[in-house]
Amino acid sequence: NRLLYNGVLGEKTMLGHCIHISPAEMDILRETGTMVCHNPESNMGNAVGCSPVLQLFQKGILIGLGTDAYTHDMLESLKVLLPMQRHNACLPNVGWREATGMLFENNAKICARYFKKPLGVLKPGAAADVIIMDYKPFTPFSHENVDGHMLFGMEGKNCRTTIINGKVLYKDREFVGIDEDKINAFC
């Protein structure tokens, strides 16, 4: 209520974690258009609880997936998210669509509230942010089961090439145009 009273909540506000949040507070977030970023590994690592992701979805709150700097690997966070939500709900068949939706759809929607150029989508005029994975699936791979491969097969270390805003920054597992020794010396 303090955040609402002081005018902090709104369509450009993102709250992290939201672990101990009541249904009434969820309603406030929905009514103000406030977003939530769930950071499952951080929550587990700090033993602070589990965000009620499925309830936030049911309330119509835009919730994305983050890392809280606990990892740099979004696929790792995705893999933790699904079993964590299933464990929290004591239901082994929930959360599939929500988990991948948070990373691939909702994170793009969140970015759209902050940036003019579309991010997280492949379409003309959008930032050409793409990763190319070196992944050899053991089972058939198609657009219909890509989520399963992301959750159970791929890992961040499979990333072979990274393109950001149309510029290749990492190719064949080597940085392009970046002096790693110079950066490491500075660190």
PLM regions: where:
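Active-site core of metal-dependent hydrolases
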Residues: 1-72, 89-94
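His/Asp/Glu-enriched, well-ordered alpha-helical/loop segment
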Residues: 6-8, 52-137, 151-154
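Ser/Thr-centric signal marking residues that sit
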Residues: 13, 67, 104, 161-162
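Flexible loop residues that form catalytic
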Residues: 18-19, 86, 136, 167
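Asparagine-centered polar/low-complexity signal
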Residues: 39, 43, 106-107, 165
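Short Asp/Glu-rich motifs
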Residues: 48-49, 75-76, 144
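C-terminal cap of metal-dependent C-N hydrolases
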Residues: 127-177, 184
